[in-house]
């Protein structure tokens, strides 16, 4: 794959586009929102600076071209990645529009956070070329990418996707079953559910919970995955503790009131200046810069 088109320039699009361009792909990008198209250049530049800090080889052949016209953006593409909002009908609509504009062998990849790929491809005319390509945020720093074949995805599409990801220096992980949330978000949301339950019960403050996780299990899991950690701790220890603890853990199927109350007030986090914590524009810039620096340092340490 040499020519990529990224559809959507919100949270994920700029970092994805910058990563692909850095790997030598010709990249075009599209967003229906003129404001996002205008702002995208800042995202490309910020991502490129981080990739330089990571010493990722710069194979860029040209700058990323931003379009306000979808057909112009996908012209000649052999890979199209959609990063539009998490709405099944919208994703299907986008792919249906693109199908009429690209060659038959162009791969259609979705960066959905958890909608089963089989459900997305079922609404398309050419489901065999539809595949999940779930990046983590920030996509230009976190190297793991989930590759999710739907029930109708052709094996060759999976192979091509894995090869393309490896050329970017990222790490492709093939998900064997197309379950909602795939793997990363199923694990993450299980952790989030328990964390929110502990805060709601008054067991711990949000600040102390963040410190506890970051400097406790988060610190370990950056180096040793959960299954390897079981072996290191001892399966007998897990069996003993899990025997009494598992039944005490949250198994709620709804979203915590702690979250719903805030979202109803449009307290959405960084994007609104208020969420769990309060943010000023200056604090947001400082937090994002610090996050990038620390994630770069962690990636370098793990790759050493």
Features from the language model and the residues they span:
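NAD(P)+-binding Rossmann beta1-loop-alpha1 motif at the extreme N-terminus of oxidoreductases
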Residues: 1-50
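Helix N-cap / loop-to-helix initiation motif
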Residues: 33, 154, 204-208
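Rossmann-fold dinucleotide-binding core
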Residues: 107-185
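Hydrophobic/aromatic beta-strand patches that form the interior of the parallel beta-sheet core
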Residues: 28, 67, 81, 131-133, ...
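Active-site-proximal catalytic alpha-helix in oxidoreductases
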Residues: 15, 139-148, 168, 173, ...
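NAD(P)-dependent Rossmann-like dehydrogenase/reductase catalytic/cofactor-binding core
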Residues: 2, 23, 170, 201, ...
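Rossmann-like NAD(P)-binding element
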Residues: 32-35, 49-108, 115
């Amino acid at each position: 794959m040499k020519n990529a088109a990224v559809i959507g320039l919100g949270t994920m699009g700029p970092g994805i586009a910058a990563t692909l361009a850095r790997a030598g792909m010709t990249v075009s990008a599209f967003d229906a929102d003129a404001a996002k198209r205008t702002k995208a250049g800042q995202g490309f530049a910020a991502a490129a600076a981080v990739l330089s800090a990571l010493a990722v080889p710069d194979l860029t052949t040209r700058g990323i071209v931003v379009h306000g016209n979808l057909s112009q953006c996908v012209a000649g593409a052999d890979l199209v990645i959609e990063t539009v909002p998490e709405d099944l009908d919208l994703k299907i609509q986008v792919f249906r529009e693109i199908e009429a504009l690209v060659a038959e062998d162009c791969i259609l990849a979705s960066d959905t956070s958890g909608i089963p790929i089989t459900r997305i491809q079922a609404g398309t005319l050419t489901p065999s070329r539809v595949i999940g390509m779930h990046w983590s945020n920030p996509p230009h720093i976190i190297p793991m990418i989930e590759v999710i074949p739907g029930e109708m995805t052709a094996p060759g599409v999976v192979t091509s996707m894995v090869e393309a990801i490896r050329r970017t220096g990222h790490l492709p992980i093939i998900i064997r079953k197309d379950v909602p949330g795939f793997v990363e978000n199923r694990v993450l949301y299980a952790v989030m559910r328990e964390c929110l339950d502990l805060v709601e019960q008054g067991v711990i403050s949000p600040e102390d919970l963040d410190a506890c996780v970051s400097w406790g299990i988060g610190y370990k899991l950056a180096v040793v995955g959960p299954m390897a950690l079981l072996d290191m701790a001892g399966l007998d220890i897990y069996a003993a503790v899990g025997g009494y603890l598992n039944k005490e853990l949250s198994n709620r199927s709804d979203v915590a009131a702690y979250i719903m109350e805030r979202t109803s007030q449009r307290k959405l986090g960084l994007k609104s200046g208020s969420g769990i914590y309060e943010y000023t524009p200056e604090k947001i810039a400082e937090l994002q810069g610090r996050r990038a620096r620390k994630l770069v340092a962690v990636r370098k340490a793990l790759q050493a």
